């Protein structure tokens, strides 16, 4: 015989069902809340998503700590240029404009949990030891030390650096290291500029030959040409403004001539084709080396020098660029 449920049993079942439904809804609400918090944390701190950008005030504090103003570059990079306007360096009778080959710089980029700094410091031989000691004491790594040009007088060296940590502490450490040099740290707008040489070459002529956009900086025509692939180091993308773009500089030296220098950023398979092309076009290779320690793909930096008719040199440089996986115009 089929049993009949009492009102108490029916009410009990209804209450249990209602309680179960409420529990499920509460659990779902909790999971949704946790999911939203996790997504927000990913946005704030990284994990492949967009991270919070430093405020202008944060970068201003970095600039003040170093003692020199800087500017934002593509890729959320804050870069400070430190030209060695205190040095008078000649190469085979050509006095170098500091912008051509004597430009120290440091560049900062915020990562999810810290700030990265990379840089290139132009140093006299006497400055190398004290600067290296100061950086090592502060936890900033030296990743390379070498020449960029040949036959220069007085001798100059180039120290490449890399560090990770809190941005202001990195800036303070760099200021201490720079205090062992005579690098000018003038207030913005008061840097000493060299007198420009008379010239019959113009920027747009070089742009046409190189098929790239350049800029004029204190009498030097500059081109920065990024590589097409991403450059990574320690799971962080290295922006071109942090020293991984091919740099080509022209210093007019009268009439239609220019002194050129810079560096090609290359993978291993490109090294010898570019050497061959440069030499075929009267451009000397002055150095080949690395600037970093853990980058991917592995990069080689090839420095060059020539003093000749500017458009002729530009044509040779264009042929060399065509041997590389560089971003097109």
Residue ranges and their predicted role:
Residues 1-20:
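N-terminal secretory signal peptides that target proteins for export/translocation
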Residues 8, 36-41:
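Intrinsically disordered, low-complexity regions enriched in polar/acidic and amide residues
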């Amino acid at each position: 015989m089929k049993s009949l449920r009492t009102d108490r049993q029916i009410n009990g079942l209804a209450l249990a069902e209602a309680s179960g439904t409420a529990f499920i809804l509460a659990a779902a609400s909790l999971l949704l809340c946790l999911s939203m918090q996790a997504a927000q944390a990913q946005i704030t701190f990284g994990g492949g998503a967009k991270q919070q950008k430093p405020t202008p005030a944060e970068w201003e504090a970095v600039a003040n700590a170093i003692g020199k103003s800087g500017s934002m570059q593509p890729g959320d990079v804050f870069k400070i240029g430190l030209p060695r306007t205190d040095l008078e360096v000649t190469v085979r009778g050509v006095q170098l404009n500091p912008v051509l080959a004597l430009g120290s710089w440091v560049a900062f980029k915020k990562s999810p949990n810290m700030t990265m700094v990379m840089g290139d410091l132009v140093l006299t031989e006497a400055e190398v030891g004290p600067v290296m000691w100061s950086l090592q004491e502060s936890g900033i790594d030296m990743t390379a030390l070498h020449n960029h040009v040949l036959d220069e007088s007085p001798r100059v060296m180039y120290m490449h650096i890399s560090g990770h940590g809190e941005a202001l502490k990195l800036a303070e450490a760099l200021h201490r290291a720079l205090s062992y040099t005579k690098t000018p740290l003038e207030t913005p707008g008061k840097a000493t500029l060299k007198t420009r040489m008379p010239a019959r070459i113009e920027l747009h002529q070089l742009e046409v030959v190189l098929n790239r956009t350049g800029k004029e900086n204190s009498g030097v025509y500059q081109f920065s040409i990024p590589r097409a692939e991403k450059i990574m180091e320690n799971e962080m993308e290295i922006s071109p403004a942090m020293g991984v773009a091919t740099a080509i500089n022209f210093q007019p030296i009268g009439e239609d001539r220019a002194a050129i220098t810079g560096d090609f950023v290359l993978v291993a398979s490109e090294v010898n084709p570019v050497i061959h092309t440069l030499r075929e076009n009267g451009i000397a290779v002055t150095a080949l080396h690395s600037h970093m320690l853990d980058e991917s793909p592995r990069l080689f930096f090839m420095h060059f020098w020539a003093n000749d008719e500017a458009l002729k040199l530009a044509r040779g440089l264009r042929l060399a660029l065509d041997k590389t996986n560089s971003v097109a115009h």
